[in-house]
Amino acid sequence: MTVLPDLLDFDPDAALALLGEWMAARGEPAYRAAQVFGRLWQRPVRSFDEMTELPKALREGLAGSFRITALELTTRQKSMDGTEKFLFRMHDGQLIETVAIPDGDRLTFCISSQAGCALQCAFCATGAMGFQRNLHPSEIAGQVRELRMLTPSIVPTNIVFMGMGEPLMNWKAVSPTLSLLNDPRALGIGARHITISTVGVLPGIVALAARPEQFRLAISIHAPSDALRRTLMPVNTKYPLADVIAAAREFDRRVTFEYVMLGGVNDQPEHAAQLAQLARDCRAFVNLIPLHPGGSMGFSPSTTPTINAFAKAIRARGVETAVRRSRGLDIAAACGQLRTERLGRRLPVAAQDHGEVHVA
């Protein structure tokens, strides 16, 4: 059985070229290609049949030549603080999570780039699931499409790749997704309002830095020394802290360090001093993240006084820092929590919660 090409998997240039060739071969006017592409992203629809401005014969022809991926919404939860969490099922039954975070006049969509994650960070629910597969552009940017179709009046001001998965280990799909998110012919979100979060996958950082757009980079540091970071993040064996810091230094935009606060593990005064030194080395902004209160693998959240003292110690060393405000605590808004609950598995450990995202 022939699988039709999914128009949502192509970046804007490739999709418009493909549609243009298809239209020309059928004697259709050239403007039809942009018309169809606009209905995929700017005024999104779930099927060609909904493009009622097109002649019926053209809609039928498109449906016979291409497909449009649909994500099935299985769960939608809204927190008392306005945060919303969405669980989508894909064509093969895999589940992914998306979070919408309102904050004044800003609305941030936190999107997933993989089903599960291979990195097994000690405090992360997504890593505890294991890795299932990479997502396609249609499934990554498609999360934004789906939220736009669910609530057309709500337009995101910011996108963060801080959901399930490591985006820079799926660069083949994330790169065209960035184009779809940013290009004014598609979703048209400013590059400086799109943040890619990584544990420090060096080839991906280099590839991101090579792009001309001013996309933001956030690096999950979580420990200021190799010895401690290896115990929390096995990936540190492949990408040691010194190499990650060097890559951050070479990145031509200011980088954000993300640092989840683990009680008695990485929240002591000496850790603050070490972290401040790393941040100063590459002019990074530090975002401190209170550990989500769920989970049971030996980690406890740092106390509020400890977090405040930690932030004060970093600022005293000349480094800008912020403490992320916890959001969605009543709806399992930590990475992987909702998916784990729906699959009937016991959540082994808390993940980073999707609080207010501070990016320098």
From Swiss-Prot:
Gene: rlmN
Entry similarity comment: Belongs to the radical SAM superfamily. RlmN family.
Bound cofactor: record note: Binds 1 [4Fe-4S] cluster. The cluster is coordinated with 3 cysteines and an exchangeable S-adenosyl-L-methionine.
Species assigned in the record: Gemmatimonas aurantiaca (strain DSM 14586 / JCM 11422 / NBRC 100505 / T-27)
DNA repair among keywords: no
Highest rank taxon of the organism: Bacteria
Residues in coiled coil: none
Protein name: Probable dual-specificity RNA methyltransferase RlmN
Active site: 97 (proton acceptor), 335 (s-methylcysteine intermediate)
Binding site for [4Fe-4S] cluster: 117, 121, 124
Function: Specifically methylates position 2 of adenine 2503 in 23S rRNA and position 2 of adenine 37 in tRNAs.
Binding site for S-adenosyl-L-methionine: 165-166, 197, 220-222, 292
Keyword presence, S-adenosyl-L-methionine: yes
Cystine pairs: 110-335
GO BP term (any one): tRNA methylation
